[in-house]
């Protein structure tokens, strides 16, 4: 990593990975409450990704459901 943008890009990738991981496990929960917690955590990670994307001046995704796909 050579600059601030490199650090932000890494954080952005990690946040998207975390969101996708939380989304990916939702179907495996038999307990609805656990699924809800996972969905809330995913939403939180997406907010982090959004802030990092804004800091990097990246455009918003063209497709609506770009997470968990």
For the regions a protein language model found, what residue spans apply to each?
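All-alpha RGS (Regulator of G-protein Signaling) helical domain and cognate RGS-like helical scaffolds
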Residues: 1-69
């Amino acid at each position: 990593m050579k600059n601030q943008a490199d650090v932000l890009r890494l954080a952005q990738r990690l946040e998207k990975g975390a969101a996708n991981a939380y989304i990916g496990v939702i179907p495996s929960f038999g307990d609805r409450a656990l699924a809800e917690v996972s969905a809330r955590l995913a939403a939180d990670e997406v907010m982090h990704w959004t802030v990092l994307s804004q800091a990097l001046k990246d455009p918003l995704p063209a497709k609506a459901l770009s997470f968990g796909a």
